[in-house]
Amino acid sequence: MAIHLYKTSTPSTRNGAVDSQVKSNPRNNLIYGQHHCGKGRNARGIITAGHRGGGHKRLYRKIDFRRNEKDISGRIVTIEYDPNRNAYICLIHYGDGEKRYILHPRGAIIGDTIVSGTEVPISMGNALPLSATDMPLGTAIHNIEITLGKGGQLARAAGAVAKLIAKEGKSATLRLPSGEVRLISKNCSATVGQVGNVGVNQKSLGRAGSKCWLGKRPVVRGVVMNPVDHPHGGGEGRSPIGRKKPTTPWGYPALGRRSRKRNKYSDSLILRRRK
């Protein structure tokens, strides 16, 4: 979708660049309410994810990540905004009467036909297993399963795309959007194409209120805090952090420290770490 610029009448509109308007009129049987409790707190009330709170109320859209309507063609009826993700979603009407939401593939328009199965053509929006003979090396894919039948878990954000680079034995080698190269079972399925709304990183909200509507709180630098609140805090005026390297509010090394847990079962499946 295109980026929309407003006429420069106020500072907020002068600096803003938002998506072109995509209406959302979700179906009642495909949505349900969700209770946002905690706002970044754990069960003890301690902040575990900072800068979260407030925001507009949302209704969750049930997205079909499994794509288990096999060999039944469906038609894209609407392209809608989803407040729970950066990507847009499509409402699909299948031939058997089923109606489901899927992630909007880049370039898909209203009226296009999609299908999922083991022997379906390699066209945008179709879902098929990585072992399919029709899926050649170099295919751009998204919504990739890690566990068979669990549904897509990889490459689901706006503009995300992975590439199939090899097939050998029972595994397929993928290059993920992060740059990581890893093995996936060839029986797992994926959707052909790239997730839509590629220009989401060109958006500029223009004002603090727009970010507040998204449930994002202000971010405060540690160097302007008091020593009781952050290791970088304290000093007179604009003072340095007083350490050789920057740290987190809890004193751990920041900016580049690897946070992945050791000895995970998937370590043997990762051929090259993310960038």
Curated annotation (Swiss-Prot):
Localization: Plastid, Chloroplast
Gene3D superfamilies associated with the record: 2.30.30.30, Nucleic acid-binding proteins, Ribosomal protein L2, domain 3
Keyword check for Lyase: no
SMART domains for this protein: Ribosomal_L2, Ribosomal_L2_C
PROSITE patterns: RIBOSOMAL_L2
The entry's keywords: Chloroplast, Plastid, Ribonucleoprotein, Ribosomal protein
Protein's UniProt keywords contain Nucleotidyltransferase: no
A GO-annotated cellular component: mitochondrial large ribosomal subunit
Region (Disordered): 1-22, 226-275
Gene Ontology biological process: mitochondrial translation
Main location: plastid
GO terms assigned for molecular function: rRNA binding; structural constituent of ribosome; transferase activity
Superkingdom to which the source organism belongs: Eukaryota
Family: Belongs to the universal ribosomal protein uL2 family.
Protein name: Large ribosomal subunit protein uL2cz
Organism: Chloranthus spicatus (Chulantree)
Chain's gene name: rpl2-A
